[in-house]
Amino acid sequence: MAVIVLAAGAGTRMKSTTQKTLHSIGGRTLLSHSLHAAAGIDPARIVAVIGHGREQVGPAVAEVAEQLGRSIDTAIQEQQNGTGHAVQCAMEQLEGFEGTVVVTNADVPLLSPETLQELTATHDGASVTVLSVNQDNPTGYGRILRTNDGMVTAIVEEKDATEKQKEITEVNSGVFAFDAAILRDGLAQLNTDNAQGELYLTDVLSIARRAGHPVRAHIASDAAELAGVNDRVQLAAAGAELNRRTVTAAMRGGATIVDPATTWIDVDVQVGQDVTILPGTQLLGTTTIGDNAQIGPDTTLENVKVGEGAQVVRTHGFDSTIGPRAEVGPFTYIRPGTVLGEEGKLGGFVEAKKANIGRGSKVPHLTYVGDATIGEYSNIGASSVFVNYDGVNKHHTTVGSHVRTGSDSMFIAPVVVGDGAYSGAGTVIKEDVPPGALVVSGGKQRNVEGWVAKKRPGTPAAEAGEAAAKRVAEGGSPTSTPQADQE
Protein backbone atom coordinates (compact mmCIF):
# COMPACT_ATOMS: atom_id res chain seq x y z
CA MET A 1 0.00 0.00 0.00
CA ALA A 2 1.07 3.59 -0.67
CA VAL A 3 -0.36 6.86 0.65
CA ILE A 4 -0.26 10.19 -1.18
CA VAL A 5 -0.74 13.29 0.99
CA LEU A 6 -1.68 16.44 -0.94
CA ALA A 7 -0.02 19.51 0.62
CA ALA A 8 0.68 21.81 -2.34
CA GLY A 9 -2.18 24.31 -2.07
CA ALA A 10 -1.68 28.04 -1.53
CA GLY A 11 -4.18 28.38 1.31
CA THR A 12 -4.86 32.03 0.51
CA ARG A 13 -7.85 32.18 2.86
CA MET A 14 -5.51 31.75 5.83
CA LYS A 15 -4.08 35.20 4.99
CA SER A 16 -0.67 34.16 6.27
CA THR A 17 2.97 34.07 5.23
CA THR A 18 3.03 30.57 6.71
CA GLN A 19 1.92 27.84 4.31
CA LYS A 20 -1.52 26.56 5.26
CA THR A 21 -0.55 23.03 6.28
CA LEU A 22 2.10 24.35 8.67
CA HIS A 23 -0.44 25.99 10.96
CA SER A 24 -0.83 24.01 14.17
CA ILE A 25 -3.51 22.55 16.40
CA GLY A 26 -3.00 20.21 19.32
CA GLY A 27 0.77 20.59 19.24
CA ARG A 28 1.24 19.41 15.65
CA THR A 29 0.99 21.09 12.28
CA LEU A 30 -1.88 20.13 9.99
CA LEU A 31 0.75 18.45 7.81
CA SER A 32 2.08 16.46 10.76
CA HIS A 33 -1.40 15.27 11.72
CA SER A 34 -2.03 13.99 8.19
CA LEU A 35 1.36 12.27 7.91
CA HIS A 36 0.88 10.60 11.30
CA ALA A 37 -2.50 9.30 10.12
CA ALA A 38 -0.94 8.00 6.91
CA ALA A 39 1.85 6.27 8.81
CA GLY A 40 -0.74 4.77 11.13
CA ILE A 41 -1.87 2.30 8.44
CA ASP A 42 1.75 1.19 7.89
CA PRO A 43 2.03 1.75 4.12
CA ALA A 44 5.09 0.71 2.17
CA ARG A 45 5.41 4.23 0.75
CA ILE A 46 4.26 7.73 1.68
CA VAL A 47 4.54 10.58 -0.82
CA ALA A 48 3.82 14.19 0.16
CA VAL A 49 2.98 16.50 -2.73
CA ILE A 50 4.33 20.00 -2.08
CA GLY A 51 4.13 23.20 -4.10
CA HIS A 52 3.30 26.59 -2.61
CA GLY A 53 5.70 27.36 0.22
CA ARG A 54 7.73 24.25 -0.48
CA GLU A 55 10.81 25.88 1.04
CA GLN A 56 8.87 25.66 4.33
CA VAL A 57 6.93 22.46 3.72
CA GLY A 58 9.80 20.31 2.45
CA PRO A 59 11.86 20.57 5.67
CA ALA A 60 8.68 20.07 7.69
CA VAL A 61 8.03 16.76 5.89
CA ALA A 62 11.60 15.66 6.66
CA GLU A 63 11.14 16.57 10.33
CA VAL A 64 7.96 14.50 10.63
CA ALA A 65 9.66 11.59 8.85
CA GLU A 66 12.41 11.71 11.47
CA GLN A 67 9.84 11.75 14.28
CA LEU A 68 8.07 8.75 12.76
CA GLY A 69 11.32 6.91 12.09
CA ARG A 70 10.46 6.20 8.47
CA SER A 71 11.04 7.60 5.00
CA ILE A 72 8.58 9.98 3.36
CA ASP A 73 9.10 10.98 -0.26
CA THR A 74 8.17 14.35 -1.69
CA ALA A 75 6.85 15.25 -5.13
CA ILE A 76 6.82 18.85 -6.33
CA GLN A 77 3.78 20.29 -8.07
CA GLU A 78 5.31 23.31 -9.77
CA GLN A 79 1.99 24.74 -10.97
CA GLN A 80 -1.24 23.93 -9.19
CA ASN A 81 -3.55 22.56 -11.87
CA GLY A 82 -5.98 20.61 -9.73
CA THR A 83 -5.99 17.50 -7.58
CA GLY A 84 -5.60 15.23 -10.58
CA HIS A 85 -2.40 17.01 -11.55
CA ALA A 86 -1.11 16.77 -7.97
CA VAL A 87 -1.61 13.00 -7.97
CA GLN A 88 0.06 12.75 -11.38
CA CYS A 89 3.13 14.38 -9.80
CA ALA A 90 3.03 11.93 -6.90
CA MET A 91 2.69 8.88 -9.14
CA GLU A 92 6.02 9.75 -10.75
CA GLN A 93 7.53 8.81 -7.39
CA LEU A 94 5.59 5.52 -7.42
CA GLU A 95 6.69 4.25 -10.81
CA GLY A 96 6.19 0.49 -10.95
CA PHE A 97 4.19 0.39 -7.73
CA GLU A 98 1.34 -2.12 -7.66
CA GLY A 99 -1.40 -2.37 -5.10
CA THR A 100 -3.61 0.14 -3.32
CA VAL A 101 -2.90 3.87 -3.43
CA VAL A 102 -4.65 5.98 -0.79
CA VAL A 103 -4.96 9.71 -1.49
CA THR A 104 -5.63 12.11 1.36
CA ASN A 105 -5.19 15.80 2.13
CA ALA A 106 -2.91 17.64 4.53
CA ASP A 107 -5.67 20.01 5.65
CA VAL A 108 -7.87 17.35 7.28
CA PRO A 109 -6.14 17.07 10.67
CA LEU A 110 -8.74 14.98 12.52
CA LEU A 111 -8.69 12.06 10.08
CA SER A 112 -7.67 8.96 12.03
CA PRO A 113 -5.73 5.86 10.98
CA GLU A 114 -8.77 3.81 11.99
CA THR A 115 -10.95 5.54 9.39
CA LEU A 116 -8.28 5.03 6.73
CA GLN A 117 -8.16 1.34 7.64
CA GLU A 118 -11.95 1.11 7.27
CA LEU A 119 -11.66 2.75 3.84
CA THR A 120 -9.03 0.26 2.65
CA ALA A 121 -11.07 -2.66 4.00
CA THR A 122 -14.11 -1.50 2.01
CA HIS A 123 -11.88 -0.97 -1.02
CA ASP A 124 -10.63 -4.57 -1.13
CA GLY A 125 -11.44 -5.81 -4.65
CA ALA A 126 -12.63 -2.45 -6.01
CA SER A 127 -10.99 -0.15 -8.54
CA VAL A 128 -11.85 3.09 -6.74
CA THR A 129 -13.33 3.70 -3.30
CA VAL A 130 -14.22 7.18 -2.11
CA LEU A 131 -14.52 8.09 1.55
CA SER A 132 -17.81 9.94 1.73
CA VAL A 133 -19.71 11.67 4.51
CA ASN A 134 -23.23 12.93 5.02
CA GLN A 135 -23.33 16.68 5.64
CA ASP A 136 -26.30 18.68 6.88
CA ASN A 137 -24.94 21.59 4.84
CA PRO A 138 -23.14 20.16 1.79
CA THR A 139 -22.41 23.55 0.20
CA GLY A 140 -18.94 23.65 -1.31
CA TYR A 141 -18.45 19.89 -1.47
CA GLY A 142 -18.47 17.52 -4.42
CA ARG A 143 -21.65 15.40 -4.44
CA ILE A 144 -21.66 11.59 -4.64
CA LEU A 145 -23.89 10.38 -7.50
CA ARG A 146 -25.41 6.91 -7.22
CA THR A 147 -27.70 4.73 -9.29
CA ASN A 148 -31.14 3.76 -8.02
CA ASP A 149 -29.66 0.57 -6.58
CA GLY A 150 -27.00 2.55 -4.69
CA MET A 151 -23.96 2.05 -6.93
CA VAL A 152 -21.56 5.00 -7.13
CA THR A 153 -21.34 6.45 -10.64
CA ALA A 154 -19.54 9.76 -10.28
CA ILE A 155 -18.59 12.74 -8.14
CA VAL A 156 -19.75 16.13 -9.36
CA GLU A 157 -18.04 19.26 -8.04
CA GLU A 158 -20.16 22.07 -6.60
CA LYS A 159 -19.46 24.42 -9.50
CA ASP A 160 -20.43 21.77 -12.04
CA ALA A 161 -23.50 20.43 -10.20
CA THR A 162 -27.10 20.95 -11.28
CA GLU A 163 -29.60 22.35 -8.80
CA LYS A 164 -30.99 18.84 -8.32
CA GLN A 165 -27.54 17.41 -7.66
CA LYS A 166 -26.84 20.17 -5.12
CA GLU A 167 -29.65 18.72 -2.98
CA ILE A 168 -27.56 15.57 -2.38
CA THR A 169 -26.10 15.50 1.15
CA GLU A 170 -23.59 12.66 0.66
CA VAL A 171 -20.37 14.41 -0.26
CA ASN A 172 -16.81 13.64 -1.21
CA SER A 173 -14.29 13.97 1.62
CA GLY A 174 -11.36 14.18 -0.78
CA VAL A 175 -9.97 10.88 0.50
CA PHE A 176 -9.76 7.91 -1.88
CA ALA A 177 -8.39 4.42 -2.30
CA PHE A 178 -7.37 3.41 -5.83
CA ASP A 179 -6.02 0.36 -7.55
CA ALA A 180 -2.66 1.67 -8.79
CA ALA A 181 -3.16 0.48 -12.39
CA ILE A 182 -6.68 1.93 -12.58
CA LEU A 183 -5.38 5.20 -11.13
CA ARG A 184 -2.61 5.49 -13.72
CA ASP A 185 -5.03 4.78 -16.56
CA GLY A 186 -7.55 7.30 -15.26
CA LEU A 187 -4.96 10.02 -14.70
CA ALA A 188 -3.82 9.64 -18.31
CA GLN A 189 -7.38 10.37 -19.53
CA LEU A 190 -8.08 13.49 -17.44
CA ASN A 191 -8.93 16.78 -19.16
CA THR A 192 -9.73 20.33 -18.07
CA ASP A 193 -13.24 20.46 -19.54
CA ASN A 194 -14.91 21.75 -16.35
CA ALA A 195 -15.87 24.99 -14.62
CA GLN A 196 -12.49 25.47 -12.99
CA GLY A 197 -10.34 24.42 -15.94
CA GLU A 198 -8.40 21.97 -13.78
CA LEU A 199 -7.62 18.26 -13.73
CA TYR A 200 -10.09 16.75 -11.26
CA LEU A 201 -8.98 13.62 -9.42
CA THR A 202 -12.67 12.83 -8.96
CA ASP A 203 -13.01 12.26 -12.71
CA VAL A 204 -10.92 9.09 -12.35
CA LEU A 205 -13.94 7.57 -10.62
CA SER A 206 -16.17 8.24 -13.66
CA ILE A 207 -13.51 6.92 -16.04
CA ALA A 208 -13.21 3.71 -14.03
CA ARG A 209 -16.98 3.34 -13.90
CA ARG A 210 -17.35 3.74 -17.67
CA ALA A 211 -14.69 1.06 -18.16
CA GLY A 212 -16.81 -1.33 -16.11
CA HIS A 213 -14.64 -1.36 -13.00
CA PRO A 214 -16.31 -1.57 -9.57
CA VAL A 215 -16.51 1.76 -7.73
CA ARG A 216 -17.47 1.99 -4.07
CA ALA A 217 -18.04 4.56 -1.36
CA HIS A 218 -17.33 4.10 2.33
CA ILE A 219 -19.49 6.45 4.41
CA ALA A 220 -17.47 7.72 7.37
CA SER A 221 -19.22 7.27 10.70
CA ASP A 222 -17.67 10.43 12.16
CA ALA A 223 -18.21 13.49 9.98
CA ALA A 224 -16.09 15.70 12.26
CA GLU A 225 -12.98 13.73 11.30
CA LEU A 226 -13.28 14.99 7.74
CA ALA A 227 -13.67 18.69 8.44
CA GLY A 228 -11.22 20.60 6.26
CA VAL A 229 -9.25 23.66 7.33
CA ASN A 230 -9.18 26.54 4.86
CA ASP A 231 -9.21 29.62 7.09
CA ARG A 232 -8.56 30.69 10.67
CA VAL A 233 -12.15 30.11 11.73
CA GLN A 234 -12.00 26.49 10.59
CA LEU A 235 -8.56 26.15 12.18
CA ALA A 236 -9.97 27.21 15.54
CA ALA A 237 -12.96 24.89 15.15
CA ALA A 238 -10.74 21.93 14.30
CA GLY A 239 -8.47 22.75 17.23
CA ALA A 240 -11.39 22.87 19.63
CA GLU A 241 -12.76 19.55 18.38
CA LEU A 242 -9.34 17.91 18.57
CA ASN A 243 -8.87 19.20 22.11
CA ARG A 244 -12.30 17.92 23.12
CA ARG A 245 -11.31 14.46 21.91
CA THR A 246 -7.91 14.60 23.62
CA VAL A 247 -9.36 15.78 26.93
CA THR A 248 -12.09 13.13 26.74
CA ALA A 249 -9.48 10.42 26.16
CA ALA A 250 -7.54 11.61 29.22
CA MET A 251 -10.67 11.42 31.38
CA ARG A 252 -11.53 7.97 30.07
CA GLY A 253 -7.95 7.00 30.90
CA GLY A 254 -8.45 7.81 34.57
CA ALA A 255 -7.75 11.54 34.93
CA THR A 256 -10.10 13.99 36.63
CA ILE A 257 -10.44 17.18 34.60
CA VAL A 258 -12.53 19.62 36.59
CA ASP A 259 -13.35 21.95 33.69
CA PRO A 260 -12.78 20.42 30.25
CA ALA A 261 -13.81 23.67 28.56
CA THR A 262 -10.77 25.54 29.94
CA THR A 263 -8.28 22.68 29.77
CA TRP A 264 -6.06 22.26 26.71
CA ILE A 265 -3.99 19.13 26.15
CA ASP A 266 -1.78 18.53 23.11
CA VAL A 267 -1.99 15.17 21.36
CA ASP A 268 1.52 14.07 22.37
CA VAL A 269 0.95 14.73 26.08
CA GLN A 270 0.73 11.71 28.39
CA VAL A 271 -1.52 11.91 31.45
CA GLY A 272 -1.40 9.22 34.14
CA GLN A 273 -4.15 7.73 36.28
CA ASP A 274 -5.77 9.59 39.17
CA VAL A 275 -4.32 12.87 37.95
CA THR A 276 -6.38 15.96 38.81
CA ILE A 277 -6.30 18.85 36.36
CA LEU A 278 -7.84 22.09 37.58
CA PRO A 279 -9.35 24.88 35.41
CA GLY A 280 -7.22 27.02 33.15
CA THR A 281 -4.51 24.41 32.58
CA GLN A 282 -2.55 23.92 29.34
CA LEU A 283 -0.43 20.80 28.87
CA LEU A 284 1.62 21.23 25.73
CA GLY A 285 4.24 19.53 23.61
CA THR A 286 5.54 16.26 25.04
CA THR A 287 4.58 16.93 28.65
CA THR A 288 4.05 13.83 30.81
CA ILE A 289 2.07 13.83 34.04
CA GLY A 290 2.68 11.04 36.55
CA ASP A 291 -0.04 9.22 38.47
CA ASN A 292 -1.79 11.07 41.31
CA ALA A 293 -0.32 14.45 40.37
CA GLN A 294 -2.39 17.62 40.68
CA ILE A 295 -1.95 20.34 38.09
CA GLY A 296 -3.44 23.84 38.15
CA PRO A 297 -5.36 25.97 38.26
CA ASP A 298 -3.99 28.46 35.73
CA THR A 299 -0.91 26.44 34.81
CA THR A 300 0.96 26.04 31.52
CA LEU A 301 3.49 23.23 31.11
CA GLU A 302 5.31 22.62 27.84
CA ASN A 303 7.67 19.66 27.43
CA VAL A 304 7.70 19.14 31.20
CA LYS A 305 8.00 15.79 32.96
CA VAL A 306 5.95 15.76 36.17
CA GLY A 307 6.49 12.94 38.64
CA GLU A 308 3.83 10.99 40.51
CA GLY A 309 2.07 12.83 43.30
CA ALA A 310 3.54 16.22 42.44
CA GLN A 311 1.51 19.40 42.91
CA VAL A 312 1.92 22.27 40.45
CA VAL A 313 -0.11 25.44 41.07
CA ARG A 314 -0.31 28.59 38.91
CA THR A 315 2.98 27.86 37.22
CA HIS A 316 4.53 28.38 33.79
CA GLY A 317 7.16 25.78 33.02
CA PHE A 318 8.84 24.36 29.95
CA ASP A 319 11.62 21.93 29.02
CA SER A 320 12.12 20.85 32.61
CA THR A 321 11.51 18.08 35.15
CA ILE A 322 9.45 18.13 38.35
CA GLY A 323 10.14 15.15 40.58
CA PRO A 324 7.74 12.85 42.41
CA ARG A 325 5.80 14.49 45.25
CA ALA A 326 7.43 17.84 44.58
CA GLU A 327 5.56 21.11 45.17
CA VAL A 328 5.61 24.02 42.75
CA GLY A 329 3.87 27.38 42.92
CA PRO A 330 1.98 29.54 43.04
CA PHE A 331 3.30 31.98 40.44
CA THR A 332 6.46 30.02 39.68
CA TYR A 333 8.45 30.26 36.45
CA ILE A 334 10.43 27.15 35.51
CA ARG A 335 12.76 27.65 32.56
CA PRO A 336 14.60 25.13 30.39
CA GLY A 337 17.07 22.74 31.96
CA THR A 338 15.60 22.85 35.45
CA VAL A 339 15.31 19.61 37.42
CA LEU A 340 13.43 19.69 40.73
CA GLY A 341 14.12 16.57 42.73
CA GLU A 342 11.79 14.26 44.59
CA GLU A 343 9.86 16.05 47.36
CA GLY A 344 11.54 19.34 46.46
CA LYS A 345 9.82 22.70 46.48
CA LEU A 346 9.80 25.81 44.31
CA GLY A 347 7.44 28.25 45.98
CA GLY A 348 5.71 31.52 45.23
CA PHE A 349 7.39 33.95 42.86
CA VAL A 350 10.42 31.72 42.33
CA GLU A 351 12.18 31.56 38.96
CA ALA A 352 14.54 28.70 38.11
CA LYS A 353 16.72 28.29 35.02
CA LYS A 354 19.20 25.47 34.43
CA ALA A 355 18.85 24.63 38.09
CA ASN A 356 19.34 21.12 39.45
CA ILE A 357 17.66 21.04 42.84
CA GLY A 358 18.13 17.90 44.90
CA ARG A 359 15.73 15.69 46.79
CA GLY A 360 13.85 17.46 49.55
CA SER A 361 15.46 20.85 48.94
CA LYS A 362 13.27 23.92 49.11
CA VAL A 363 13.31 27.34 47.51
CA PRO A 364 10.12 28.67 49.08
CA HIS A 365 9.82 32.38 48.27
CA LEU A 366 10.77 35.24 45.96
CA THR A 367 14.03 33.81 44.63
CA TYR A 368 15.94 33.51 41.36
CA VAL A 369 17.97 30.32 40.90
CA GLY A 370 19.95 30.33 37.67
CA ASP A 371 22.79 28.06 36.54
CA ALA A 372 22.96 26.29 39.88
CA THR A 373 23.15 22.91 41.54
CA ILE A 374 21.62 22.50 44.99
CA GLY A 375 22.13 19.28 46.94
CA GLU A 376 19.64 17.38 49.09
CA TYR A 377 17.52 18.81 51.91
CA SER A 378 18.83 22.36 51.65
CA ASN A 379 16.73 25.48 52.21
CA ILE A 380 17.26 28.76 50.38
CA GLY A 381 15.95 31.81 52.26
CA ALA A 382 13.44 34.25 50.82
CA SER A 383 14.49 36.96 48.39
CA SER A 384 17.76 35.26 47.48
CA VAL A 385 19.44 35.66 44.10
CA PHE A 386 21.88 33.38 42.35
CA VAL A 387 23.89 36.04 40.52
CA ASN A 388 25.03 34.10 37.47
CA TYR A 389 25.79 36.71 34.79
CA ASP A 390 28.83 38.99 34.67
CA GLY A 391 27.65 40.88 31.60
CA VAL A 392 29.41 38.54 29.20
CA ASN A 393 29.29 34.97 30.51
CA LYS A 394 27.06 32.85 32.73
CA HIS A 395 28.68 31.18 35.76
CA HIS A 396 27.63 28.26 37.96
CA THR A 397 26.85 28.11 41.67
CA THR A 398 27.01 24.90 43.69
CA VAL A 399 25.21 24.62 47.03
CA GLY A 400 25.73 21.44 49.01
CA SER A 401 23.30 19.30 50.97
CA HIS A 402 21.65 20.31 54.28
CA VAL A 403 22.56 23.95 53.71
CA ARG A 404 20.52 26.75 55.32
CA THR A 405 20.80 30.21 53.84
CA GLY A 406 19.28 33.36 55.31
CA SER A 407 16.89 35.66 53.55
CA ASP A 408 18.29 38.05 50.97
CA SER A 409 21.44 36.02 50.35
CA MET A 410 23.34 36.76 47.15
CA PHE A 411 25.38 33.99 45.53
CA ILE A 412 27.96 35.66 43.26
CA ALA A 413 28.91 32.92 40.80
CA PRO A 414 31.14 31.04 40.42
CA VAL A 415 30.97 29.99 44.06
CA VAL A 416 30.65 26.79 46.10
CA VAL A 417 28.82 26.50 49.43
CA GLY A 418 29.82 23.33 51.27
CA ASP A 419 27.51 20.79 52.89
CA GLY A 420 25.87 21.84 56.14
CA ALA A 421 26.82 25.52 55.83
CA TYR A 422 24.67 28.43 57.02
CA SER A 423 24.50 32.03 55.82
CA GLY A 424 23.21 35.04 57.69
CA ALA A 425 20.43 37.21 56.34
CA GLY A 426 21.60 39.71 53.76
CA THR A 427 24.87 37.91 53.11
CA VAL A 428 26.68 38.49 49.83
CA ILE A 429 28.58 35.26 49.15
CA LYS A 430 31.51 36.02 46.88
CA GLU A 431 33.92 33.29 47.98
CA ASP A 432 33.61 29.56 48.60
CA VAL A 433 32.11 28.61 51.97
CA PRO A 434 33.62 25.63 53.84
CA PRO A 435 31.35 22.78 54.97
CA GLY A 436 29.61 23.46 58.26
CA ALA A 437 30.62 27.14 58.33
CA LEU A 438 28.48 30.20 59.01
CA VAL A 439 29.06 32.92 56.44
CA VAL A 440 28.15 36.57 57.09
CA SER A 441 29.26 39.55 55.07
CA GLY A 442 27.79 42.60 56.79
CA GLY A 443 29.76 44.65 59.32
CA LYS A 444 28.45 45.83 62.68
CA GLN A 445 25.25 47.83 62.38
CA ARG A 446 25.79 51.59 62.77
CA ASN A 447 22.96 53.89 63.97
CA VAL A 448 23.31 57.63 63.26
CA GLU A 449 21.25 59.25 66.00
CA GLY A 450 19.11 62.27 65.00
CA TRP A 451 19.83 61.93 61.28
CA VAL A 452 16.18 62.25 60.20
CA ALA A 453 15.48 65.37 62.27
CA LYS A 454 18.64 66.98 60.91
CA LYS A 455 18.35 65.95 57.26
CA ARG A 456 14.55 65.80 56.86
CA PRO A 457 13.20 68.44 59.25
CA GLY A 458 9.48 69.04 59.29
CA THR A 459 8.58 65.73 57.69
CA PRO A 460 6.13 63.30 59.29
CA ALA A 461 9.06 60.94 59.84
CA ALA A 462 11.04 63.64 61.69
CA GLU A 463 8.05 64.55 63.86
CA ALA A 464 7.33 60.90 64.67
CA GLY A 465 10.99 60.31 65.52
CA GLU A 466 11.17 63.31 67.85
CA ALA A 467 7.99 62.22 69.65
CA ALA A 468 9.29 58.67 70.07
CA ALA A 469 12.65 59.95 71.36
CA LYS A 470 10.80 61.83 74.11
CA ARG A 471 8.91 58.66 75.03
CA VAL A 472 12.14 56.70 75.25
CA ALA A 473 13.68 59.40 77.46
CA GLU A 474 10.69 59.01 79.76
CA GLY A 475 11.04 55.21 79.76
CA GLY A 476 8.45 54.54 77.06
CA SER A 477 8.44 52.57 73.79
CA PRO A 478 10.52 53.57 70.72
CA THR A 479 7.55 52.77 68.49
CA SER A 480 3.85 53.50 68.50
CA THR A 481 3.25 50.12 66.89
CA PRO A 482 2.06 47.42 69.31
CA GLN A 483 4.85 44.91 69.78
CA ALA A 484 4.01 41.21 69.61
CA ASP A 485 4.83 39.02 72.55
CA GLN A 486 8.10 37.17 72.01
CA GLU A 487 8.03 33.51 72.92
Swiss-Prot record:
Coiled-coil features, chain-numbered ranges: none
GO molecular function, one term: glucosamine-1-phosphate N-acetyltransferase activity
Species whose genome carries this gene: Corynebacterium jeikeium (strain K411)
CDD domains (UniProt xref): GT2_GlmU_N_bac (cd02540), LbH_GlmU_C (cd03353)
Cofactor(s) demanded: Mg(2+)
Amino acid composition bias (Polar residues), ranges on this chain: 477-487
GO cellular component terms attached to this protein's record: cytoplasm; membrane
Enzyme class name: transferase
Start and end residues of each stretch annotated as Linker: 233-253
Family: In the N-terminal section; belongs to the N-acetylglucosamine-1-phosphate uridyltransferase family. In the C-terminal section; belongs to the transferase hexapeptide repeat family.
Primary location: cytoplasm
Top-level taxon: Bacteria
Assembly description: Homotrimer.
Reported function: Catalyzes the last two sequential reactions in the de novo biosynthetic pathway for UDP-N-acetylglucosamine (UDP-GlcNAc). The C-terminal domain catalyzes the transfer of acetyl group from acetyl coenzyme A to glucosamine-1-phosphate (GlcN-1-P) to produce N-acetylglucosamine-1-phosphate (GlcNAc-1-P), which is converted into UDP-GlcNAc by the transfer of uridine 5-monophosphate (from uridine 5-triphosphate), a reaction catalyzed by the N-terminal domain.
Taxonomic classification: Bacteria, Bacillati, Actinomycetota, Actinomycetes, Mycobacteriales
Keyword Metal-binding: yes
Cofactor detail note: Binds 1 Mg(2+) ion per subunit.
GO biological process: cell morphogenesis; cell wall organization; lipid A biosynthetic process; peptidoglycan biosynthetic process; regulation of cell shape; UDP-N-acetylglucosamine biosynthetic process
Pathway(s) it belongs to: Nucleotide-sugar biosynthesis; UDP-N-acetyl-alpha-D-glucosamine biosynthesis; N-acetyl-alpha-D-glucosamine 1-phosphate from alpha-D-glucosamine 6-phosphate (route II): step 2/2; Nucleotide-sugar biosynthesis; UDP-N-acetyl-alpha-D-glucosamine biosynthesis; UDP-N-acetyl-alpha-D-glucosamine from N-acetyl-alpha-D-glucosamine 1-phosphate: step 1/1; Bacterial outer membrane biogenesis; LPS lipid A biosynthesis
EC code: 2.7.7.23, 2.3.1.157
Residues noted as binding Mg(2+) in the record, renumbered to the chain: 107, 230
Protein name per UniProt: Bifunctional protein GlmU
InterPro entries reported for this sequence: Bifunctional_GlmU (IPR005882), GlmU-like (IPR050065), GlmU_C_LbH (IPR038009), Hexapep (IPR001451), MobA-like_NTP_Trfase (IPR025877), Nucleotide-diphossugar_trans (IPR029044), Trimer_LpxA-like_sf (IPR011004)
